[in-house]
Amino acid sequence: MKSRLLLYLLLLPALLTAQPYAVRQLGIEKGLSNNYVVSIAQDKEGFLWFATEEGLNKFDGTRFITYYKNETKNGYGITGNELNCLLDDPKDSILWIGTQRAGLNAYNYVKDTFTFYRHNEAVPESIITDDVTNVIAAADGNLWVTTYWKGIEYFDKETGHFSHYNTANIPGLVSDNIWTVADGGNGKLYVGHVHNGFSILSIKDKRAKNFVHDPGDRHSLPGNEVRCVYKDLNNNIWVGTNKGLALFNPESENFIQFN
């Protein structure tokens, strides 16, 4: 009883000074193109960007500016309205836009210009497919692009060429259905699969090791649908799955489950 009273007295100042949060809703009635928001990014000028199932939205603090699929000959606009992901380039004034079936778009928000990267069967170094699930900054300043059907792409921003990492050229890679990756900065890529768990890909050797859920092992991956992978400031690898969160230990190759 005394310990509870002491805790209450310690928290009392915070409770007395706490103010209720004000939630401001910004939906289609406020100018948002669609209420299904799939990704958010902030550019270097401070503007917020929202990817939706029906267009790209820029928010300046008071209003939305919407970008839709380009229907004109001048090439201004996005290549598809159904979007999956956004990334503000860590180095350049470019917003990268991953679409569901219309390739990768790059919007230079200083020059107000769009550049498009689409699959071209006649060009081997083009993006391997137009279904982009995520765009991630590579440790060397370039990009990793994940796809739903054809594995992982490494994009060289200087040459505009894509290098392909998939089951056709990576021994041991369990699937080409990829949600996301994280660059470990140590020559390793941490891969989240749509249905087949988690992989560690050696970029130089082009080999992969896979991890899946084992119901009998509490140190295994919690679930096999890996939607997000994150390397924190202490180089820990966090894995978000459909059955909970896990912290991966690269030395023991075990997972600490949080669910």
Predicted features and spans:
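Carboxylate-rich, polar loop motifs that coordinate divalent cations or form catalytic acidic clusters
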Residues: 1-259
